[in-house]
């Protein structure tokens, strides 16, 4: 059978009926833009839906409903201090998210963030943007060397074999049962009309 993958907001976890319908339709994975465990960072990015209730509980609800969770995370918000790397790691471990896509914040053109940073004179001239493998294209409040080192250390700690497999096993323990999928029933008496 065909399986599906989608991206959704965290408030999907509040819709048990939709989670059930998705798993019955063979949705396997959902990507969530969690961004940060920091309330200040979530307010800064206007991710107000991520402030309602526990993000860890939301992830666990989706896992228990039968959906694998992948998460997107960002470091380098103005409100971030040097504790953000530890807090991101602890959150990802507690939530049992094996696939955590972590990047450093970029100010993409034509966004409110880009306009604000341009007005503040914080954009670096002639910088490229658009991927999560580059250093930020603006002057961050956290010293750049601290941000880059913290980011590299975070990735190294998240993707050490021991840490990764511990999260993977924990997510399997939380993952809810799914109904077996049956192949579509097709009639074999189809005729091609010419």
Language model features by range: what are they?
Residues 3-191:
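A structural motif corresponding to the C-terminal lobe/cap of the Radical SAM core domain
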């Amino acid at each position: 059978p065909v399986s599906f993958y989608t991206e959704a907001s965290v408030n999907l976890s509040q819709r048990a009926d939709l989670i059930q319908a998705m798993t019955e339709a063979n949705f396997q994975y959902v990507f969530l833009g969690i961004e940060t465990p920091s309330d200040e960072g979530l307010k800064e990015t206007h991710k107000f839906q991520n402030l309602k209730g526990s993000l860890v509980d939301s992830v666990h609800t989706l896992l228990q409903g039968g959906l694998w969770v992948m998460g997107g995370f960002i470091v380098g918000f103005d409100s971030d201090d040097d504790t953000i790397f530890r807090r991101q790691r602890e959150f990802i471990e507690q939530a049992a998210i094996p696939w955590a896509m972590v990047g450093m914040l970029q100010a993409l053109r034509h966004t409110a963030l880009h306009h604000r940073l341009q007005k503040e004179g914080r954009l670096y001239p002639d910088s490229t943007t658009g991927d999560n493998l580059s250093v930020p294209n603006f002057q961050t409040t956290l010293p750049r060397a601290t941000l880059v080192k913290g980011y590299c250390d975070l990735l190294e700690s998240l993707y050490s074999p021991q840490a990764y497999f511990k999260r993977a096993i924990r997510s399997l323990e939380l993952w809810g049962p799914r109904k077996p999928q049956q192949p579509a029933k097709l009639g074999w008496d189809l005729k091609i009309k010419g």
